[in-house]
A protein has these predicted regions:
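Beta-strand elements of well-folded, non-transmembrane domains
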Residues: 98-104, 155
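A short hydrophobic beta-strand element
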Residues: 90-100
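Core segments of small alpha/beta cavity-forming domains
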Residues: 13-82
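Residue-level signal for tight coil/turn positions that link beta-strands
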Residues: 87-91, 157
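Mixed-charge, low-complexity intrinsically disordered segments
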Residues: 60-61, 102-145
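Sec-dependent N-terminal signal peptides
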Residues: 1-3
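C-terminal motif of bacterial Sec signal peptides marking the signal peptidase cleavage site
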Residues: 7-10
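Short beta-strand edge/turn micro-motifs at domain boundaries
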Residues: 118-125, 141-183
Length: 185
């Protein structure tokens, strides 16, 4: 009982029962998130090897691994809200807002912090800021960006789906990319 009360308080809001296309999109969103998390987990070992082989020292290696974990945590923590649904039978168009870490504002905050510190080398600042960023992302204490996206859904074999391009844009937004791709923020 105590645990359930704590969980309700920590969520901050009650989750309403989803229905119709909202529920169908929720399934898709969570499948995209699961796929991304699986890819992150599958590549974790490879990333660790790459970090060890491509850096000059342990600090750089740790910074690279922290970057990877920061992106992973931001992606896992991404959420959405449905703003509008246009149901057209076997097709639907949803206006959604994806909420995730605003890396631009977070970086600006860290740079302001750096300016106030005297006698801190760039390397020390990089290490400190990566660790601070990771802590903030894990605790959900970061600036948040809300980005609108139009999602085209279609029904195939009685199952609602989105196409690969839409899925890639959605994943990009879940990572915080304002352009909706994993390679340009």
């Amino acid at each position: 009982m105590l645990i359930s009360s704590f969980m309700l308080v920590s969520c901050g809001e009650k989750k309403e029962e989803l229905t119709g296309l909202h529920k169908e999109f929720d399934i898709i969103f969570n499948e995209v998130k699961e796929e991304g998390v699986s890819e992150f987990n599958a590549n974790k070992e490879e990333i660790a090897k790459e970090a060890k082989n491509s850096t000059r020292n342990e600090k750089e290696e740790k910074a690279m691994l922290n970057t990877y974990e920061i992106m992973f945590e931001a992606f896992k923590g991404s959420t959405y809200s449905v703003e509008n649904i246009n149901d057209m039978g076997d097709k639907a168009e949803l206006q959604i807002k994806v909420k995730t870490v605003d890396f631009i504002k977070l970086t600006e905050e860290l740079l302001e912090n750096y300016k106030s510190k005297n006698n801190v080398s760039e390397e020390e600042f990089l290490m400190e800021s990566m660790e601070e960023m990771l802590k903030k992302v894990k605790k959900g204490k970061t600036p948040v960006i809300e980005q609108e996206i139009t999602v085209q859904m279609f029904k195939e074999n009685d199952k609602w789906k989105i196409n690969d391009n839409t899925k890639n844009v959605l994943m990009g937004k879940m990572f915080g990319s304002q352009k909706g791709t994993l390679f340009s923020f």
